[in-house]
């Protein structure tokens, strides 16, 4: 992190987050607002995980659930949230850091929710949907390096929506796998509710309702509340993020995934995350790299793995790329039973007042 001429903190985030000529921080969307995709900024699997022996990501799933009374007196229902956090192998590229080299830590956060009525025993009735979803949000807090996301369809998506997707998430491996793993956490929380990834992905579109980011936080939010009230019983979100780090540095932050159902039922999953960027691999011996689990991939192999028109050009074929073992350089700790932030209850009350004024 550096300072500009006015003494303000600056970083590559301000440049990296530019989409189609405008900054993400200035954007605000309607309840079902479609984002604009940036030309030439798509992400390929080769960008996230170049070929090599360290290609297996590190994934952790957690869930939360709450059972309460349906807002119109139709009985009790349960809202469940399953979250998958998948960390991909750290990648070193000589082109980062204005040519001085640096590490990319890519990860996805996928959250799936379901609302179902329960019987007199408190067991979920699988086919009895409670259309009570209100909103979902993902928050990264305590950021101190160049952690960012984009608005492109292969960086963010959500279902439900009442429009057909312009991007086929069922064919996108990162979203498909992330939602599938999120469901492995959601299903036990919802009494082994039988839901498949395609159920969500076939309706997923590239949109967010609102967002915020500054030097220490990043937030994406999806509102599912229609003008006439709640319309959906299920929802799912997908978010890809990237942390660009200098060699021999570390980053610790938290990830929150929160879902809220009517009339006032929030559920929350939370992780503590630490990234440790290895030393500059170009200065290390082969034996040291092997000992630390770092593998060198010639960029010609990486370029060959990318489809035509991918974000990274083959003109960088002389760049050497290194891939590190995520198990050695990434720590993820799920937080047990995190409390609901006061701001969520405050927002619930504010939204209730807004709804009452409209009615």
UniProtKB/Swiss-Prot annotation:
Residues 40-59, 340-359 are annotated as: Disordered. Has antibacterial activity against other haloarchaeons. Interacts with the membrane of the target cells where it causes permeability changes that result in an ionic imbalance leading to cell lysis and death. Transmembrane segments: none annotated. Residues 1-46 form the signal peptide. It is found in: Secreted. One of its GO terms (biological process) is defense response to bacterium. Its main location: secreted. Coiled coil: none annotated. It comes from the Archaea. Keywords: Antibiotic, Antimicrobial, Bacteriocin, Plasmid, Secreted, Signal. One of its GO terms (cellular component) is extracellular region. This is Halocin-H4.
């Amino acid at each position: 992190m550096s300072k500009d001429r006015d003494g303000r903190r600056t970083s590559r985030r301000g440049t990296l987050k530019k989409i189609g000529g405008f900054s993400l921080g200035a954007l605000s969307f309607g309840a079902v607002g479609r984002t604009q995709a940036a030309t030439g900024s798509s992400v390929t699997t080769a960008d996230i995980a170049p070929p090599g022996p360290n290609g297996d990501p590190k994934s952790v799933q957690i869930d939360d659930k709450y059972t309460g009374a349906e807002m119109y007196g139709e009985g009790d229902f349960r809202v469940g949230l399953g979250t998958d956090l998948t960390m991909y192998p750290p990648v070193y590229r000589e082109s980062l850091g204005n040519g001085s080299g640096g590490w990319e830590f890519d990860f996805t956060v996928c959250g799936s929710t379901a609302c179902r009525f329960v019987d007199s025993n408190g067991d979920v009735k699988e086919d009895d949907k409670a259309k009570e979803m209100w909103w979902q949000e993902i928050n990264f807090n305590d950021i101190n390096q160049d952690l960012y996301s984009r608005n492109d369809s292969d960086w963010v998506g959500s279902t439900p929506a009442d429009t057909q997707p312009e991007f086929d998430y069922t064919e996108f491996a990162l979203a498909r796998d992330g939602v599938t793993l999120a469901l492995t956490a959601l299903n036990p929380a919802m009494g082994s509710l039988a839901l498949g990834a395609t159920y969500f992905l076939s309706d997923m579109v590239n949109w967010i309702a609102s967002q915020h980011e500054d030097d220490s936080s990043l937030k994406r939010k999806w509102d599912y509340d229609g003008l006439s009230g709640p319309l959906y019983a299920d929802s799912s979100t997908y978010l890809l993020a990237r942390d660009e780090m200098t060699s021999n540095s570390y980053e610790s932050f938290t990830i929150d995934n929160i879902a809220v159902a009517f009339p006032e039922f929030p559920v929350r999953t939370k992780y503590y995350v630490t990234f440790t960027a290895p030393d500059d691999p170009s200065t290390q011996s082969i034996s040291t790299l092997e000992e630390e689990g770092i593998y060198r991939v010639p960029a010609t192999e990486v370029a060959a793995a990318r489809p035509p028109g991918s974000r990274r050009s083959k003109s960088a074929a002389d760049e050497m790329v290194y891939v590190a073992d995520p198990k050695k350089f990434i720590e993820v700790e799920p937080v047990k039973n995190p409390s609901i932030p006061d701001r969520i209850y405050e927002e619930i009350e504010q939204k209730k007042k807004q709804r009452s004024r409209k009615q």
